Amino acid sequence: MKILKKKSKITSIQIISGKYKNSRIPIINTKNLRPTTNYIRETLFNWISNEKIKKSHCLDCFSGSGALGIEAVSRYALSSTCIEIQKKAIFFLKKILIKLSITNVHVIRANTIQWLKKPNKSYDIIFLDPPFKTTLLKQTIALLIKNNWLKNNALIYIEQENTLNKLITPPNNWILKKEKKTKKIHYSLYMNVNNF
């Protein structure tokens, strides 16, 4: 008997504002892929001034669908670098970039932790939304600091599970700018201040 493989369910979310407003981004239903909701993305980008975004090179450390990186360039960020390890997620991300003729989103298939061990350049805005119930967030923050991935006054967005006594404690020189929470998710925006 032939065993049929279960196909990944594909849904989509939309770009909220800017150059690619209302464009749909495909989302595959696969392990550890948990795209930031439209509501949370809208809140996040309302926290960041348009002037800041337009001058920024962004890094999305656990890109998944690429929604955060694409939203940033839609709002005229200079560039976004998206790091993702899952092959299917990369396939659909590259497909939407081609469809929308986006050339300033750079997609890298890599293990984020390993990639951050090799310093490359500093970024203005960093998105951190790793899979829940892992130590990835803690490891990523340590590497961002150790290897100077953050420019002075860089903004760091963190999305984590809203679990009592398990929220990450940020570095002393990261100033909390904004935070909100839902029943399951705690999300916050920090500023890196090197001369703190």
UniProtKB/Swiss-Prot annotation:
This is Ribosomal RNA small subunit methyltransferase D. It comes from Buchnera aphidicola subsp. Baizongia pistaciae (strain Bp). Specifically methylates the guanine in position 966 of 16S rRNA in the assembled 30S particle. GO terms for molecular function: 16S rRNA (guanine(966)-N(2))-methyltransferase activity; nucleic acid binding. PANTHER family: METHYLTRANSFERASE. Belongs to the methyltransferase superfamily. RsmD family. The keyword Cell cycle does not apply. InterPro entries: DNA_methylase_N6_adenine_CS, RNA_MeTrfase_RsmD, SAM-dependent_MTases_sf. Its EC number is 2.1.1.171. PROSITE patterns: N6_MTASE (PS00092). Keywords: Methyltransferase, rRNA processing, S-adenosyl-L-methionine, Transferase. It catalyses: guanosine(966) in 16S rRNA + S-adenosyl-L-methionine = N(2)-methylguanosine(966) in 16S rRNA + S-adenosyl-L-homocysteine + H(+). SUPFAM superfamilies: S-adenosyl-L-methionine-dependent methyltransferases (SSF53335).
